[in-house]
């Protein structure tokens, strides 16, 4: 399974990551959401390099031009609700993509542990399509793998899956690598953090409170 860490090269992406991490700047809810959207757009552009293309002849006012256009049928899926601004960034670039949504939540127990429950899925046919499974935070990876399995159960198995996250933990990346199809999955992370707390919060991470969800799921 391939991992692409987008901030391994210095680009304008660094500015958006810095702002969503900054505890003062991220209190501006509109900027926070817009930066998630921008990071989604940048990630979508990078993923587009890995898709299948076929030549298409288009007619211009002065003649004809041959352009390589995306051949894959794309489905953009996210876990509600924190993923919505990030999800929109992908739709801005893949504007003819289908949508899929998973509503999942963390159910805590008295001993401090938790299980992840899926309560709602909206998903069409995934067979022979490319699935972009996007979630701002990839912490333990358990909710994302659970979402993937639920989507496949309802819509069938996609021909390829791109997992995208704004911030990913090393533990989450490892979990996804071991529990999703290795030859048919690529992980894209804008940034990777090393530490994951006992409550499954990524450190230094960021806060998703400004898009109606507490700091982290799993």
Where are these regions (language model features)?
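PRPP-associated nucleotide enzymes
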Residues: 1-213, 218
């Amino acid at each position: 399974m391939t991992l692409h860490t987008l901030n391994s090269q210095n680009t304008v992406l660094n500015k958006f990551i810095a702002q969503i991490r900054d505890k003062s700047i991220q209190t501006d809810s509109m900027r926070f959401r817009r930066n998630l959207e921008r990071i989604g757009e940048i990630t979508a552009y990078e993923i587009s390099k890995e898709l299948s293309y076929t030549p298409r002849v288009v007619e211009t006012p002065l003649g004809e031009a041959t352009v390589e256009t995306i051949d894959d049928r794309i489905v953009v899926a996210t876990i509600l609700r924190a993923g919505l601004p990030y999800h929109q960034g992908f739709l801005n670039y893949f504007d003819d993509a289908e949508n899929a949504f998973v509503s999942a939540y963390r159910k805590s127990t008295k001993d401090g542990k938790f299980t992840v429950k899926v309560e709602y899925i909206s998903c069409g046919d995934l067979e022979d399509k490319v699935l972009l499974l996007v979630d701002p935070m990839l912490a333990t990876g358990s909710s994302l793998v659970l979402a993937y399995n639920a989507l496949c159960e309802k819509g069938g198995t996609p021909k390829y899956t791109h997992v995208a996250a704004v911030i990913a933990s090393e533990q989450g990346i490892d979990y996804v690598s071991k529990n999703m199809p290795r030859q048919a999955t690529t992980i894209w992370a804008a940034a990777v953090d090393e530490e994951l707390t006992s409550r499954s919060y990524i450190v230094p991470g960021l806060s998703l409170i400004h898009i109606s969800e507490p700091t982290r799921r799993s």
